[in-house]
């Protein structure tokens, strides 16, 4: 209890700053693993988004994180740009958790310096940080007093295009959205006609992307090593 009391005397803002400082040092000292470098090279060698889409297909991962990596290569053709992008997304996730989560102060601090937020979702340049950020955003949206079906639908669509682990979570948010929609009794209480039009457009684009992605996966020939 004495240790917990001493920790509680330090402001959460200070702990967040400490988290940011330690993780940015870790980013600069981290040597990319093979799977991280593979994702970087795929994005770097792609001449356009369509080529990126085709080159990413054999990995089996959705396109969102490779697209962010591709944007990072346009900013600076050095892997550090991807690592800084990863750090920025992790920093935003950490801020949202510290600022808006309902947990006790000590629990927030322990979470920040836990294995996943500190190492796996921050120092390793992989898809998981986008998954973390979208989950936090989705949790904020579904618990908000002013429920936004449009924003929640966007989060669900992005989760489906992030990682296989996000599909179950996306379905959870989708069920919450359907429940909230049914509880309203009248769709006009949740969304305007303009928003409904945008939802239809986003839904069509989303399903087109799914079809194109899986067509690219099916048409990609993976070379088998000869023995």
What are the roles of these predicted feature ranges?
Residues 2-4, 141, 169-207:
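Perimembrane helix-loop-helix junctions
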Residues 40-88:
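Short hydrophobic/aromatic helix or loop-helix immediately within or flanking a transmembrane segment
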Residues 84-109:
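Transmembrane-helix motifs of polytopic, lipid-linked glycan transferases
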Residues 106-118, 132, 136:
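Transmembrane and membrane-interface helices of multi-pass
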Residues 123-130:
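Short acidic/glycine- and proline-prone juxtamembrane loop motifs at membrane-interface regions
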